[in-house]
């Protein structure tokens, strides 16, 4: 099992929790189920649930009807996955701004906590 960590900004915002709090019940349930799959499978989780993006950033995917949630994350030493940010996606490509935000949060996490 992998430990799932929700990234918090220095001002104590939790972007993934904010996303989860905004989701409708069915989409929330599917998103939480996908996070559970990540917890159970770690880096072995593959499409359609998880996809590598770039710079060791990965994307979790959950779909309910026409809505698709994406939660970006990275792995750290000790069987841990850090969920950085997420959004509801309407297009095929992950927005560059979301990938850049995930990279920024990853760098911030590593600066504050190292690779623990």
Q: Where in the sequence are the language-model features?
A:
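Basic, Lys/Arg-enriched alpha-helical interface segments
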Residues: 1-68, 77-81, 90-116
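Conserved catalytic cores of phosphodiester-cleaving nucleases, focusing on short active-site segments
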Residues: 84
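Compact, Lys/Arg-rich rRNA/RNP-binding cores from ribosome-related proteins
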Residues: 87
């Amino acid at each position: 099992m992998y430990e799932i960590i929700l990234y918090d900004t220095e001002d104590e915002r939790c972007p993934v929790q904010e996303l989860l709090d905004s989701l409708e019940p069915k989409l929330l349930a599917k998103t939480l189920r996908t996070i559970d799959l990540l917890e159970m499978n770690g880096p072995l989780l593959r499409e359609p649930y998880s996809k590598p993006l770039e710079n060791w950033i990965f994307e979790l995917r959950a779909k309910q009807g026409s809505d698709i949630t994406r939660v970006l994350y990275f792995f750290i030493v000790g069987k841990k996955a850090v969920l950085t940010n997420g959004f509801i996606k309407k297009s095929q490509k992950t927005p560059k701004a979301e990938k850049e935000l995930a990279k920024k949060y990853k760098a911030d996490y590593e600066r504050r906590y190292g690779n623990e």
